[in-house]
A protein has these predicted regions:
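Catalytic machinery of carbohydrate-active enzymes
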Residues: 1-376
Length: 376
C-alpha cells in the first residue's frame, strides 16, 4: 500500500500542487532522493529574483547568480521574467524555477515563501510583485503603502536617480554589473554573464558550417547590424557594416550576419551586395540556436544589444558601438573595444534625433575595421 506522506518542509514542494518529481515521474515523498529540508541557515536561502525585461537586460543580470551561490551555496533560486524573455534563462543550472508573468503571480507569491527578494526592475509591475513579497528581505526596489518607490540601500537609490535623470546617467562611470553587485551586496562585481549552450544547438551550428562549406579553421566575424525595435538610434550605418564586411571578406574571413526578424531589413541589404563569404545565420533561430551561432564567431561587431551581452557571456572578443546609450554602463570584461560616436550630446537616451548627422553616423568604418583587426 502506498504511503502518501507529504514532506511539507521540502524546498521542492510548491504547496498548492504536486512537485515536479511527483508530477513528471510519479515519485512519492517517502522514496524521493531530492528532499531538501527548509532551513533558516545562512547558506540555505529561498531567493526570488524579479527581472522581467528587456531580453538583453535579463541576460546580463544573470551574473548575480554566481555571487548569490557564493554567498548562499545551498540556496534555491526562482526568477520571475516576462514570458517573451524567458528563453535566455532556460537551462541555467543556477535557477531552480523560471516563472513567467503570464502566470497567476499574486497566487504564486502568496503560496510561496522567500527569504530574499531581489528586484532589479523599476517598472510598476516589478515593484508591485516585490511589494507582494512583504515578508521577505527585499534587495533593490519595492513600493511602500503609498506607492512610493523604496530603494534598499544607497546604491539602489543612486540607480533610481540615474533612471530619473538622464544627466546623471550620462555622467555615470560604472558598469551595470558594478551597480547591481552593490545593490545586492555581492562580494565582487566581475562575475560572468551566463549563456547556456545546448548540445543539440551546438550540433546544429556545426551542421550550419558544413552546409555552407565553412572550414573550422576559418576565422569568423559575426556582425549584428540591428538594434531591436525600441532603439532605432542605436544602429550604426548600413554603409559602415557593408564596408566592414567587404574588408574582412577580402582578407579571407567569413562574415556571419546575426539577428532576428527585426533585423531582416539590414541583413538582406548587406546580402544584396553579394560580398563573397558573407552569410546570414538566419533570422528565425531559437534563442539556443542563436547563442550557438554566436559561439561560432571569433569576434562580434554589434551595438548595445542583446547579442552583445550574449557574445560577452560566451567570452568572444567584441567591438561594440555606442551613441545614445551609456558606454560606461556596459561591461565587456576586457575582451574587445568600445567605440563611441563623436557628438557633444552623446548618451542622450533619446529615441529620436533631428540632427543632420546623428552620433552613430560619426563612427567611421576605418575606426571600426582597425578595432576588429586587433582581434581577428
Amino acid at each position: 500500500m502506498k504511503n502518501f506522506t507529504i514532506n511539507t518542509d521540502c524546498l521542492n514542494f510548491p504547496l498548492d500542487r504536486p512537485c515536479s518529481y511527483q508530477k513528471n515521474d510519479g515519485i512519492l515523498c517517502e522514496e524521493c532522493n531530492q528532499y531538501k529540508k527548509i532551513s533558516n541557515s545562512q547558506e540555505n536561502k529561498r531567493i526570488l529574483i524579479i527581472k522581467l525585461g528587456a531580453m538583453g537586460d535579463v541576460l546580463r543580470s544573470t551574473f548575480v547568480l554566481w555571487g548569490l551561490k557564493e554567498l548562499y551555496p545551498k540556496s534555491t533560486i526562482s526568477w520571475i521574467v516576462d514570458s517573451k524573455n524567458a528563453a535566455v534563462l532556460e537551462h541555467n543550472a543556477f535557477i531552480n524555477n523560471i516563472i513567467t508573468n503570464d502566470e497567476n503571480l499574486s497566487n504564486f507569491l502568496i503560496n510561496n515563501f522567500f527569504d530574499i527578494v531581489i528586484n532589479l526592475d523599476l517598472a510598476f509591475e516589478s515593484l508591485s510583485l516585490a511589494k507582494l513579497s512583504n515578508k521577505a528581505k527585499v534587495m533593490g526596489f519595492t513600493l511602500d503603502d503609498n506607492r512610493n518607490i523604496v530603494a534598499s540601500n544607497d546604491f539602489a537609490l543612486q540607480w533610481l536617480k540615474m533612471s530619473a535623470y538622464d544627466e546623471l546617467k550620462k555622467n555615470n562611470h560604472f558598469t551595470y554589473q558594478h551597480w547591481m553587485a552593490q545593490i545586492v551586496s555581492l562580494p565582487k562585481d566581475n562575475y560572468e554573464i551566463i549563456v547556456p549552450l545546448q548540445k543539440k544547438a551546438q550540433e546544429k551550428a556545426l551542421n550550419f558550417l558544413n552546409t555552407n562549406n565553412i572550414a573550422l579553421s576559418k576565422k569568423i566575424l559575426g556582425i549584428n547590424p540591428g538594434a531591436g525595435k525600441r532603439w532605432n538610434l542605436k544602429k550604426w550605418t548600413l554603409e559602415g557594416f557593408i564596408e566592414t564586411a567587404k574588408h574582412f571578406s577580402k582578407k579571407g574571413n567569413i562574415v556571419l550576419l546575426l539577428g532576428g526578424k527585426q533585423d531582416e531589413k539590414e541583413i538582406n541589404a548587406i546580402l544584396k551586395e553579394n560580398i563573397p563569404d558573407v552569410i546570414s545565420a538566419g533570422t528565425n533561430n531559437t534563442i539556443s540556436d542563436f547563442f550557438a551561432k554566436i559561439n561560432l564567431c571569433d569576434t562580434v561587431l554589434c551595438g548595445d544589444t542583446m547579442a552583445l551581452h550574449a557574445a560577452v557571456g560566451l567570452k568572444k572578443n567584441v567591438v561594440t558601438l555606442f551613441g545614445p546609450t551609456s558606454i560606461n554602463e556596459i561591461e565587456i570584461y576586457s575582451r574587445g573595444l568600445k567605440i563611441q560616436g563623436k557628438k557633444d550630446c552623446i548618451t542622450c537616451y533619446k529615441q529620436e534625433c533631428y540632427l543632420e548627422n546623428n552620433c552613430m553616423q560619426t563612427i567611421k568604418s576605418r575606426e571600426v575595421i582597425n578595432a576588429i583587426e586587433k582581434y581577428l
